[in-house]
């Protein structure tokens, strides 16, 4: 059996789009009862995906806006990004576009492993962003797209499978061996 791989994933988006709900559904299989703004939480989960075992570290960030400064801890050592907007909020999609540009600029990259996620698909009667709009943006960014309902746990696992797929697409060759330390003589 192949050794376990570590993946560090950062979940980003504006306030109240459901980042914590998606993360908690995936990690703990439950939805928070009430909304409490997140400062920052880190979660761990061991999963098996496509025959490989992964230790997934998930950073659930505080809600951002277009004026937020991208914190260094959200760019250093991160393998992939889950960029979440609410299908009920046009402004949350605009924030995601700005965040995407900030991440690319911070990393000096044209493309990064990421998944665009339209959350709150259960609120279809309040929808302001069509599924096609999400797909179109994901196609422009050349990344995966998933619509989900964190509240109802619909497609939540798919979000995390897709980010692992995106990270693995960007991986070249085997991971470097773990350093064991050195001895100076």
Curated annotation (Swiss-Prot):
GO cellular component, one term: cytoplasmic vesicle
Short name of one Pfam family: Ras
EC number: 3.6.5.-
Residues given in the record as GTP binding sites: 18-21, 35, 38, 119, 122, 150
Residues with a covalently attached lipid (S-farnesyl cysteine): 182
Motif window: Effector region: 35-43
Keyword field contains GTP-binding: yes
InterPro entries given in the database record: P-loop_NTPase, Small_GTP-bd, Small_GTPase, Small_GTPase_Ras-type
Main location: membrane
PTM annotation (Cysteine methyl ester): residues: 182
CDD domains cross-referenced by the UniProt entry: RheB
Subcellular location(s) per record: Cell membrane
Proregion residues excised on maturation: 183-185
Membrane topology label: Lipid-anchor
GO terms for MF: GDP binding; GTP binding; GTPase activity; metal ion binding
Job of this protein: Binds GTP and exhibits intrinsic GTPase activity.
Name of protein: GTP-binding protein Rheb homolog
Source organism of the structure: Dictyostelium discoideum (Social amoeba)
Classification of source organism: Eukaryota, Amoebozoa, Evosea, Eumycetozoa, Dictyostelia
Name of the encoding gene: rheb
